[in-house]
């Protein structure tokens, strides 16, 4: 199972699936990518004390909505955005955003973005591909993140297969122990 996750993550790094976006004027694209580059820099530092600085520079905290990789991870507002950033930086792993491969699409006055990323979990030796989607909004000439969704970019069939294999192996071990003890 771990090999399959590693292999899929490796494939995504070598030949990532491209996501189409709009062709935007270069100046607009560069300005819109500013908060994503800054967010990437803060994730590289992984300093929980910098969570408020990160929010002030990259995020619209009052409108912020973040959906994490787990079903129960729904964060709204400044307090919960700070909580997510601090926990990610303390416990999750090293997240690297591939900002240059970000696809941007106009959505009225806002921009929708999709970008590939990798997370190297602290206690494992492999990276998991992540896809991050969200909304950028312009305020006073600067772009800020107002919505984020982190998505595990893995084939869930591998996870289900691993669970089934683990259950079969556990049942086999228990039956073997019962047979030896009889």
What positions do the PLM features span?
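Short beta-strand edge/turn micro-motifs at domain boundaries
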Residues: 129-159
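Short beta-strand segments enriched in hydrophobic/aromatic residues
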Residues: 59, 117-119, 149-152
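C-terminal single-pass membrane-anchor helix
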Residues: 156-182
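A solvent-exposed, acidic/Ser-Thr-rich amphipathic alpha-helical stretch
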Residues: 52-109
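Short, low-complexity N-terminal intrinsically disordered segments enriched in polar/charged residues
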Residues: 1-53, 166
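Short, cysteine-centered beta-strand-loop-beta hairpins and adjacent loop/turn segments enriched
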Residues: 90-92, 119-127
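Residue-level preference for beta-strand/loop junctions
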Residues: 109-113, 127-128
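Hydrophobic/aromatic beta-strand elements that line small-molecule binding cavities or substrate pockets
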Residues: 99-104, 117-119, 131-137
